[in-house]
Amino acid sequence: MSCSGSGADPEAATACAASVAGPAPLVSAPAALPTSTAAESKASPAGTAGGPVAGVATAGTGPVAARAGEPAERRGPASVAAGGAAPPEGAMSNGVYALPSAANGEVKPVVSSTPLVDFLMQLEDYTPTIPDAVTGYYLNRAGFEASDPRIIRLISLAAQKFISDIANDALQHCKMKGTASGSSRSKSKDRKYTLTMEDLTPALSEYGINVKKPHYFT
């Protein structure tokens, strides 16, 4: 194939030489991004397409990136990297998992308040062993003024339970002391126990109350 007028026009001569030489071989694109794409990546803000975050997400780490070249059917379930794992339903604060309701500020009590309401209603018709006047007197001495009689009776019940537990523990110490002394079992059923300070002291020590034996003068 001949080209005419190639000496007059250099551009026409170049085009004619290219057509004579045939189609150019395919050249693989360079690995680096074009200048325009790199400029767009620098100009894009974080979190948008082409920004630094998108570049990190595309690159990937761990087993997901190692199997990126495999076919989709051979990959199987890809493990999620620690950095890209989505948080659970609750919020993560300093590595501590919080329930969704607690994260939203909607904290509800676990125990229902219905039994407590019923118990307070029963206190209106209940007369404790300790009179209300005695409990109210000691509350006033401690600087607590209770106008609701149910509160006074509730404190009276707590005091009764505390004294009852101490008395039962002291009785157990007394029985153990009697068993260790070698008394017969037949007589122990009808035996009457008298609690002394020796029985009361170990029982009180379990509750953090240290009682010293009073001095005996002759």
UniProtKB/Swiss-Prot annotation:
The modification N6,N6,N6-trimethyllysine is found at K189. It is found in: Nucleus. Residues 27-39, 77-86 have a biased composition (Low complexity). A motif ([KR]-[STA]-K motif) lies at residues 187-189. One of its GO terms (molecular function) is histone acetyltransferase activity. One of its GO terms (cellular component) is transcription factor TFTC complex. Disulfide bonds: none annotated. Keywords: Acetylation, Methylation, Nucleus, Phosphoprotein, Transcription, Transcription regulation. InterPro entries: TAF10. It holds the Pfam family TAF10. Residues 27-50, 64-86 are annotated as: Disordered. The modification Phosphothreonine is found at T48. The modification Allysine is found at K189. The modification Phosphoserine is found at S44. GO terms for biological process: allantois development; apoptotic process; embryonic placenta development; G1/S transition of mitotic cell cycle; gene expression; hepatocyte differentiation; in utero embryonic development; lateral mesodermal cell differentiation. The modification N-acetylserine is found at S2. Its main location: nucleus. The [KR]-[STA]-K motif is specifically recognized by the SETD7 methyltransferase. Belongs to the TAF10 family. PANTHER family: TRANSCRIPTION INITIATION FACTOR TFIID SUBUNIT 10 (PTHR21242:SF0). The TFIID basal transcription factor complex plays a major role in the initiation of RNA polymerase II (Pol II)-dependent transcription. TFIID recognizes and binds promoters with or without a TATA box via its subunit TBP, a TATA-box-binding protein, and promotes assembly of the pre-initiation complex (PIC). The TFIID complex consists of TBP and TBP-associated factors (TAFs), including TAF1, TAF2, TAF3, TAF4, TAF5, TAF6, TAF7, TAF8, TAF9, TAF10, TAF11, TAF12 and TAF13. Component of the TFIID basal transcription factor complex, composed of TATA-box-binding protein TBP, and a number of TBP-associated factors (TAFs), including TAF1, TAF2, TAF3, TAF4, TAF5, TAF6, TAF7, TAF8, TAF9, TAF10, TAF11, TAF12 and TAF13. Component of the TATA-binding protein-free TAF complex (TFTC), the PCAF histone acetylase complex and the STAGA transcription coactivator-HAT complex. The PCAF complex consists at least of TADA2L/ADA2, TADA3L/ADA3, SUPT3H, TAF5L TAF6L, TAF9, TAF10, TAF12 and TRRAP. This is Transcription initiation factor TFIID subunit 10. The lineage of its organism: Eukaryota, Metazoa, Chordata, Craniata, Vertebrata.
